[in-house]
């Protein structure tokens, strides 16, 4: 969901509606809204991550501009599976140091979309795709080849939709 209601403004609007005594149908007050209110709420520019097929496709105005194999998180290790859902890109950082309980990784391109889970290059990997994630999976992030991470980073903007599914 890319809509987020403005609770303070919504409370004010509801109080005013109740005090007016007039029955009404109204749209909630939003802090921000999705790219459209039609049948396609994400628009035509977004990142699609297919965990089953270990693939990332970045669509720009409906055209795939990046299509790459990935290594996602290992779903068999608690806390390491890549979360599914619809997100908005939180930030872009280059370079970045990613830290966890038992690791520290230097990456050139960091694009988080779900807290500490994001898309990034993985210079320590020479292969991507297939079933690698089942025995060499990440801690939840989406690892992509360096050149593909650079291309995604150059074209993605904070707030763009990221759709992750199995």
Regions found by a protein language model. Give the residues of each.
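Surface-exposed, secretory/extracytoplasmic low-complexity segments enriched in Ser/Thr/Asn/Gly/Pro
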Residues: 1-78, 86-87, 91-104, 109, ...
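Exported/periplasmic cell-wall-interacting domains
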Residues: 81-84, 96-166
